[in-house]
Amino acid sequence: MIDTLRPVPFASEMAISKTVAWLNEQLELGNERLLLMDCRPQELYESSHIESAINVAIPGIMLRRLQKGNLPVRALFTRGEDRDRFTRRCGTDTVVLYDESSSDWNENTGGESVLGLLLKKLKDEGCRAFYLEGGFSKFQAEFSLHCETNLDGSCSSSSPPLPVLGLGGLRISSDSSSDIESDLDRDPNSATDSDGSPLSNSQPSFPVEILPFLYLGCAKDSTNLDVLEEFGIKYILNVTPNLPNLFENAGEFKYKQIPISDHWSQNLSQFFPEAISFIDEARGKNCGVLVHCLAGISRSVTVTVAYLMQKLNLSMNDAYDIVKMKKSNISPNFNFMGQLLDFERTLGLSSPCDNRVPAQQLYFTTPSNQNVYQVDSLQST
């Protein structure tokens, strides 16, 4: 299982930053020797990012490998063009990393960040790497003309979001029982389907069925009456602070809203019990339930994984792998992954290495009806 990551200190030799004014000047000048790396969750990157930046949102499941030195930075890109661009330019360009907000970082307080880990790794690999003071929030507030915003493209049901490579080492598309396992020592660029061909970056067009009554989707799925009717969805769990419950006044759907942003400071785990209870209520009434956030890759995934952990007695890794097999572009932020680890300890669950659930018991490992998981046997805990 994943251990809690040790802090990566911002040693004085690596605590080097660039201001947003400096970055704006470089962009105004058209500096072609500038490589921007956006370290925020994929959902935030797709909503808006600094022009020309490439996304390196790293799921917590991969950070330990990176920290131990088992994973080069170039392996964090599954998109060939991004990987080639990084490999070609990292040795000569000025590399600038940014997260959502890093204005208060210093040598003593920046230790537990993804940026701290990446900066150290980049410098170890000989790159001239810096972090952006104030992060994306400060840059966008002062120089929004150099930000690219995509308000309509944040949902995977309309266009496939950029995949997060850190999870490429997981086997995600096979009917064999061994494919539930997290094969973290494989080359993360070698993920293949069951026939050995490279995995496609395309994502499902509609909500993904995790269990016969449980669907994982995005904001647009929650506004499509045809989709909701097709899947028998009458319960909608909205894991955002501000997206509207569109059909709430019609009386046909039951809503629950969890007011959480996709940010490292948010405590999503405090809502696990009521979210799990809401999903169970839908199951008890033989209704479908849609769990959604904005893009359907972070907050809603975290809640879905928590549900599988508690109701099926699965470790975090096993539950995560199941959702990953169904929807390959998931990317919960680092803090949410840590909360799932804490939830695993609270539930007293074993590591996946010690307590694998046999594949014949899992509905989601095969389309064969002979291996359907008996959902009615789920017991509340």
Curated annotation (Swiss-Prot):
| InterPro entries (alphabetical) | Dual-sp_phosphatase_cat-dom, MKP, Prot-tyrosine_phosphatase-like, Rhodanese-like_dom, Rhodanese-like_dom_sf, Tyr_Pase_dom, TYR_PHOSPHATASE_DUAL_dom
Could you describe the post-translational modifications of this protein? Ubiquitinated by the SCF(FBXO31) complex, leading to its proteasomal degradation.
User: Cross-referenced Gene3D superfamilies, in alphabetical order?
Assistant: Protein tyrosine phosphatase superfamily, Rhodanese-like domain
Disulfide pairings: none
Mind telling me which GO cellular component terms the entry cites? cytoplasm; cytosol; nucleoplasm
* Location of region: Disordered: 176-203
Q: Name one GO molecular function term.
A: protein tyrosine phosphatase activity
Q: Where is the composition biased (Polar residues)?
A: 189-203
Active site (UniProt): 293
Substrates-to-products reaction catalysed: O-phospho-L-tyrosyl-[protein] + H2O = L-tyrosyl-[protein] + phosphate; O-phospho-L-seryl-[protein] + H2O = L-seryl-[protein] + phosphate; O-phospho-L-threonyl-[protein] + H2O = L-threonyl-[protein] + phosphate
Extract the PROSITE patterns matched here: RHODANESE_3, TYR_PHOSPHATASE_2, TYR_PHOSPHATASE_DUAL
The Enzyme Commission number assigned here is 3.1.3.16, 3.1.3.48
Q: Keywords on this record?
A: Cytoplasm, Disease variant, Hydrolase, Hypogonadotropic hypogonadism, Kallmann syndrome, Protein phosphatase, Ubl conjugation
Predominant subcellular localization, coarse grouping? cytoplasm
Q: Which GO terms describe its biological process?
A: cell differentiation; ERK1 and ERK2 cascade; MAPK cascade; negative regulation of ERK1 and ERK2 cascade; negative regulation of MAPK cascade; peptidyl-tyrosine dephosphorylation; positive regulation of apoptotic process; regulation of heart growth
- Cell compartments where the protein resides: Cytoplasm
Occurrences of domain Tyrosine-protein phosphatase (ranges): 206-349
> What sequence ranges are listed for the domain Rhodanese?
30-148
Biological function = Dual specificity protein phosphatase, which mediates dephosphorylation and inactivation of MAP kinases. Has a specificity for the ERK family. Plays an important role in alleviating chronic postoperative pain. Necessary for the normal dephosphorylation of the long-lasting phosphorylated forms of spinal MAPK1/3 and MAP kinase p38 induced by peripheral surgery, which drives the resolution of acute postoperative allodynia. Also important for dephosphorylation of MAPK1/3 in local wound tissue, which further contributes to resolution of acute pain.
The associated disease is:
Hypogonadotropic hypogonadism 19 with or without anosmia: A disorder characterized by absent or incomplete sexual maturation by the age of 18 years, in conjunction with low levels of circulating gonadotropins and testosterone and no other abnormalities of the hypothalamic-pituitary axis. In some cases, it is associated with non-reproductive phenotypes, such as anosmia, cleft palate, and sensorineural hearing loss. Anosmia or hyposmia is related to the absence or hypoplasia of the olfactory bulbs and tracts.
What family classification does the UniProt entry report for this protein? Answer: Belongs to the protein-tyrosine phosphatase family. Non-receptor class dual specificity subfamily.
Q: Quaternary form?
A: Interacts with MAPK1/ERK2.
The name on file for this protein is Dual specificity protein phosphatase 6
**Taxonomy-wise, where does this protein's organism fall, top ranks first?**
Eukaryota, Metazoa, Chordata, Craniata, Vertebrata
Its gene? Answer: DUSP6
